[in-house]
Amino acid sequence: MATKKAGGSTRNGRDSEAKRLGVKRFGGESVLAGSIIVRQRGTKFHAGSNVGMGRDHTLFATADGKVKFEVKGEKSRKYVSIVTE
């Protein structure tokens, strides 16, 4: 008679869903007002001119134009701006 000892239970086997974070519009790309530029946790990128920040730190365009990434300030922070034509 074929028998098999009962397997032990495991406490693994779970993983969280991907949150789809990151840069959505890159430097030089044209955007319309309201377009999401960066989805992030915390302020990896800071809002520059013509860019707003949502309550989950999402950066979005407040005017039509081209995306510009720049490093500014004493602390070398990364800023995202929209350059209007």
UniProtKB/Swiss-Prot annotation:
Region (Disordered): 1-20
Listed transmembrane segments: none
Domain of life: Bacteria
Keyword line: Ribonucleoprotein, Ribosomal protein
Gene3D superfamilies in the cross-refs: 2.40.50.100
SUPFAM superfamilies xref list: Ribosomal L27 protein-like
Name of the protein this chain belongs to: Large ribosomal subunit protein bL27
Protein species of origin: Actinobacillus succinogenes (strain ATCC 55618 / DSM 22257 / CCUG 43843 / 130Z)
